[in-house]
Amino acid sequence: YKREQDSAAPRIRLTNGLAAPDMVQGPDGRFYLYYFMGGTKMISVAVCDEPAGKYEFYGYVKYSDGIAIGKKNEPFQFDPGIFMDDDGKLYLYTGFALAGNPILLDGSKPTEHGPMCFELDPSDMLTVLNGPSYIGVAGEKESIGTPYEGHSFLEASSMRKFNGTYYFIYSTMNSHELCYATSDSPVKGFQYGGILVSNGDVGLEGVPDVKHARCNTGNTHGSIIELNGKYFVFYHRH
């Protein structure tokens, strides 16, 4: 899939590539790739009959009036995480919390309340049924005095469900770590759970912070999967 297949793709390529895509299989058996196109403020979708095949542009996530999310002065739409629940409901999670980043924000405002959630119509995989709403994962300002302090939301939304519990995985303001929060609902009440992994060695004995790191640290995205009863974390290395 090439950026030029998206009609909204800016001509200038610098910082205007496809960022942090996520994919889900729809009720029709096809595979839907959700991504952020730099310079558009929207979440785009491509579709294919197989997960690793040739994707074609499909459309933009939009409200019922046809206006794309990101075009109604909402906080910045970024790093989409798409999740199909086992009851057939479809949820999109987005957000970016770093203030003062003119290259990425492009005039948009960062989220101050953590990630946003949209319930989408699974019949077309695009139309918003409910939202945006905030799920309880704290941004930097509102994290003060809470378990999220020091590990507030930055970006890289990802939702998983294991044994009836929802796990929201995200990259924190520290950038080098993935943390998680849990809830019994996909749309609210998430409580901080802890650090999944740092892509350096922060947190090991004698390494209290990045300044003392012996390994390279840098921005990380990722999530967790369960295979044959074992759980695995995948993330960025530098």
Language-model features: where?
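Carbohydrate-active catalytic/glycan-binding domains of CAZyme proteins
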Residues: 1-238
